[in-house]
Structures are given as C-alpha cells and as structure tokens.
Amino acid sequence: MRHSLTFFLFLTFFGTLIANVSEDVYVTGSVIKKTSLLVANPISTFDLNDIEKRGTLHIDNFLSNLPQINPSNSNFHSNKATGTSSVSLRGLGGTRTLILMNGKRLSPGTPMNGTAEQDLSQIPFSLIKQVDVLTGGKSTIYGSDAIGGVINFQLNRKFSGIDLSYQHSFYNHQNEDPNYERKNYDLAPNSVSDGHANTLQFSLGYEIFQDVYLTSYFNYRSVDEVTWSQRDISVCALSGNAECRASSTSPEGKFVENKVGGKTFHVKDNTFASGSTFYNFASKNHLLRPDKKNDVGILLTFENLEKHTFNVDYFKSSHKTVGQLDYSGVFRLSVDLPCNNPFLSNQQFTAICSDNGLTLSDTAPLYISRRNIEGNPRQQNFKHSTDRFVFDVDGEITNEWFYNLSFQSSRTTADFTYLNDISKQRAINALKVSGTPSKPSCVSGNDCKPWNIFLNSDGNLKSSAGLGVTKEALDYISTNLKVNAELTEDQYRFVTSKSFTTKNAVIPSLDMALGLEYRELNLKKNADDFSDGAGQQYPHSSLYGSLKVKELFSEIYLPLVTDTNLNFSIRYSDYSLEENSLTYDIGLVQLFEEKYTLKFSQQKAIRMPDINDLYSPTKVNQAFLNSDPCSGSNPSKSISECARTGVTESLYGNISNTETQINSLIGGNLNLRPETAITNSLSFLYSDEIDLEIDFYSISLKDKIGSSEVSFILDNCLETGASYYCNLIERNPTTGTFYEGS
C-alpha cells in the first residue's frame, strides 16, 4: 500500500495553466460537452507556443519541467533503456499515466517488455494544438492505467497552408567544479559543446472540398550522443561523497577461489597478486542517447454530412536509438579451470592449484570476472515502428441524442539487437585450454579459440594467444543477441449523450452519457537466449499473450442554479482473465463570481496487470543488496537467524560481502489482481491578471503490481522466519553469497 499527501502550487502569467475555453466542447476527463473549468479534476493546458518557448525537441522534456510530472523513460536513460519516452504523473510511474491523442488512447509503447507504458515519441510535434494535463484517477472515462491522470494531446485537424521549419540545438557545459577536481580520477574536458540536435517539420493542410479538410505532416529529428565522460558530474559513477564508484570486474581480472574463505587474485604482469583492482565502468555510457525519428500522417475530416462529422486518421512513426554501456566482460563466471592451462605461469599455477593440493591433472574451481577492453562497448540498438489507424464519427441520432462511434487499430514492432556481449558458455570453453603457449587448443574442440586473460592487457589485440587476447578469441566469445516483437491493439468505443431540461428550480438541467468499449491487445515476442549473455543485467525472453476487456460506463453532470456543478461517473470492466472491476468518480465544482473556483473530487481508478505482468517467464534478473547481515567475520545477525536464510554453521562468519549487485528471479503471475487507487483532490483557482491554482491531493494505492525488494525479503525472513519469505532465498551452497553463480 502506498500513501502520499502532496501540496502543489502553480503560478504563471497570462493564463497558460488554466484553459480558457469559451464554448462547450468535449474536454479531457469527460464525455459530456462542457468547459474544462467545470471538470472537477485539476487540469492544466498548454499550446504549441508554450512548448516551443522551451526550445526542446522532445515533448517529454517539456512535460518533465511541470511540477506534477516526473520523467519516466527518456533519451537520458541508457542502462535500463526501453528506447521510448514516457512520463509519470504524480510520481506514480509511466504505467499509471495514460496518454491520449485527440481524446483517444495512444498506442502501447514498446512490445519489448509488453507493458502498457506509452511512447510519447509517437506524438506529431508540429501539429500539436493543445496539451491538457489532468491529474487524478480517470478510469471511469478512459479505463485502465489512468491512476495518476491523463495527458491529452489535441492536434490541429484544420491546419491551412504550408509550414516548413528547421531547428538546431546543442548543449554547452563548463566542467569546472572544484569539488570534483580534488577526486582521484580522470576529469572531463574543460568545455564541451555536444548533443547537437536537428529537427525538420513540414505540415500541409487545406480544404479540398467544402467542409472536407485534409491535413498531413512529415517530421524528422536527429540527436547526437553525449557520453558520461563529457561531464564532470558523470565522468565516473559518483557515490554520496563525490568519490568515484568502480567495478571489481577490471581488465586485470578478479579470480576468486570457489570455497569458504577463498582467496581473491588479480593479474599483475604474468602473476597473480592478492586482492582486486577497480575499473571506472561509467565513462563509455550514454548520458544522452543518439536517435533518429521520422513521422508521417494524414488527418481527413468530413463535416456537416447530414449532421455527422467523420474523421479518418493514419499515423506512422519510426524511431531508432542506441543505448551504450561500458565494455562487457565475464562477471563472477563459474569456471573449473584446468591446472594445465598453458597460459598460467608457474606462480599462477602455484597460487590457485598447488597451494590447494591440486595437480596438473586437476581443475581449480574459480569465479572469474574480467572486463573485455579488447572489444567494443555494449550497445542496445532499438528500432521501433508504429502504425495507427483511427476512424471516428460524431452525430445526432434523434431527439437531441448525440453519439460518438470510434475504432482504432495499432501495430507496434520492435527490432532490438544487443551488440558486443560475451557468451558465458563460449567463454568457459575458451578458458578450458590445454597444449603449449605456442600451440594451445580448447578442450571442447570445434571452432573454439583459446582466450588468454592471464597477462596484463593494454586493450590491443595480439597476434598469438601466447601474448594475450587475439582477434580470433574475441570473435569466438563475442555474441550479439536479438529480439523481434509485435504488439497490436484494437479498440471499439460507442458513446451516446443527451441534455435534459427539468422543471426543478434547483436542478434546471441534467446531462447524461452512456458508453460501451471493447479493447484487445496481443503480444508476440521472439528472443534469443539472453541468459547466455554475460553482460545481461535485465535479460529478455520470448513472450506471448493477449488481454481483452469489455466495458460499460456512464457519466452524469448536474449544473445547479447556485453555481454548483456536480459530476458523477462509473465504469464496469470485465477482463478476459476472469477479473472484473468497478470504478467511480465523484466531483464538485463551485464557482465564486468570475475569479474564484473551488474543486473537489474523489475517484477510484485501476491499473490492470499488463501482458508482461501476467505472462513473463521466470528469469534471472539483476538486483541490489547494500549489505548482507549474515556476512563478514562478525555478522550482525545470530547464527539461528541466519540459518533461516540458508547459512550453515561452517559458513557463518566466513561469508564475504564485496558485491552489491546480486542475482534474483523474477517472472509473471496469472493470479494478479488489478491495482486500485483512491484519490482525493481539493483545488482552489484564481483567475484574473494572473492564474493561480493550488492543489491538495492524497492517493491510497492497494494491490500494487511489482516485485519485492530483495532487502525487504531478506529482512523479513531474518526477523520472522516466515516460510513465505525464507523460501524465496537461495544462497551459493559453497560460499554462502548471493552474487556468485547463477
């Protein structure tokens, strides 16, 4: 459960935050015609001019400057990049923020992870007419995912003329912070100008016949990379005291004996020295991902056709981006190294073999970590393409009953390639070598090439294996991993509404809307065996699944003569997984003269588990554990408490704790229930020469979908001994650690 209470203050000039709509229209957050001022949720409105003043080429960068929005995925993400751009309303996450375009749900973002998080890169920047940011639950109007709120991009359907624009931008940074200069690592350049971006936008619109409007557009954008090495704040990964964090997976390697109290070595010249060295793993990472994006689209509008309006739209968006990480390597790879490996010097043989009573015919069990600086940095290449078709018709049935019927279909594909990783199995094969330094051969035979990591490396490839790492060995152990995925969504929606007049003096009129909706998602994802990739922190796996929902909803609007306006809405959802939900929305808007408005609302909203939450297979995933209370020579927990987590008497007091990155298992669950959130909002608006909005809100989130923190599981097992937690814990049976082995 999550509870939060937050206070926001919005203060801007010239009415940019509060929409001044002079006519009744369909507004964000309602299916009944009224002004946005009468929507009980807090709502802020911006136009294209507001966005362009920021000078940004990314709509997510503009939105992230708003106080009610946090960034989710963006071009500034590399390590956990999805290749998409998204934002989070009220800090609840991108999967709990619903994105609309022209009042309709935007296509799902990426089939790579099968989540509902939508990609803002699909929005045609040049045609944005208005952006509405509505906070608070809106599942009654839009369905699942609208827990934090909705962001609606309204496009200019009646653009007239030709518009051609070009924009160039870049970053300039002075790396002169003295706090970083005192630290012991290489500094970034004194002054840099980078991240050059270019955008070309072309729009064409005209009235081809009377009341028939055609609008089309083409947008292109390219952005250059910025690496961490170009900034003083990121030239290495900084810890809390501004010192450089580092990885023990270094070019000198880390060789740990697989036994209780096993020694640790690294390569020094052609010998093993005690301990390990450290490597700056951050400098090659992307601080800003490079990308290329192009969009095309056509919007066709037919008006006044027997009291009907038809809209037919087609959108296509193509996006390429690369997320770069530092060199791969082998990370705590379990290897039974032959003691007769010809690359071992006499001193190295003595250290790991003869000192442990092993002979040339034996193997030394080791955990080996070693950075592959002879190769290239890891790169995650994303190629996304989205095709979206929308058909929409508005009209009058009879007796002032109005209706809206819409259908939309989208197809999003992803081609993903993970470059320059190392195959675990081939690395093991290449380390199991016999023969002589001049004529080494792999024990496994086949096309295996010996990998000599027992000499200091300068990063250059060698002509023969006896001198170090060769191109043949690098080619053999290197691997590229691929994913091809497709996510489709079809949605049908029908809404009918009518305004009733009454003879009641208090309630002179009543507006009512009824709606039906059907939505279906299908995911197909084919992935290589990512579990063999040594550098995979969040490995992909094949995934197939579908999700369907049938929904019925209603909204009632009561304008009272006392300038009090009441809103009620409700939605019933029936999901294909034998789950159903009922959501509601109650709102009150009180007007005081022309300057003051008071709003109150309470909503129950949901987020249904998405395809990834439901169907994802169980797989090894990277997790973080700051400390193990059962490690070290003097553990902070007793032996009886540690025994609950798998610590034996022989391991107690002999478990090392040198790593914070550990392995965990994570997967989907078909028994998941929908998340439910109760949101209460109170807003005060003042509008005169300036516009001022003050919002108070509280959110209670139950049945949150996600994985538990490993520290939470470990602490609860230690404290309670409950099998629910303790059965989730597995230590290395030999060393007792969480990070050695798989």
Regions found by a protein language model. Give the residues of each.
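Outer-membrane beta-barrel signature, preferentially recognizing the C-terminal barrel domain
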Residues: 608-693, 742
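Short loop/turn motifs that connect adjacent beta-strands in outer-membrane beta-barrel proteins
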Residues: 158-161, 208-211, 305-309, 396-403, ...
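Surface-exposed beta-strand-turn/loop segments characteristic
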Residues: 61, 65-67, 71, 75-79, ...
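Transmembrane beta-strands of outer-membrane beta-barrel proteins
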Residues: 162-164, 210, 214-216, 308-312, ...
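Hydrophobic, lipid-facing positions within transmembrane beta-strands of outer-membrane proteins
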Residues: 85, 149, 160, 198-202, ...
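Residue-level signature of outer-membrane beta-barrel architecture
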Residues: 91, 155, 206-207, 300-304, ...
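N-terminal periplasmic "start-of-domain" segments of outer-membrane beta-barrel proteins
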Residues: 24-54, 110
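Transmembrane beta-strands of outer-membrane beta-barrel pores
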Residues: 137, 168-172, 220-224, 316-320, ...
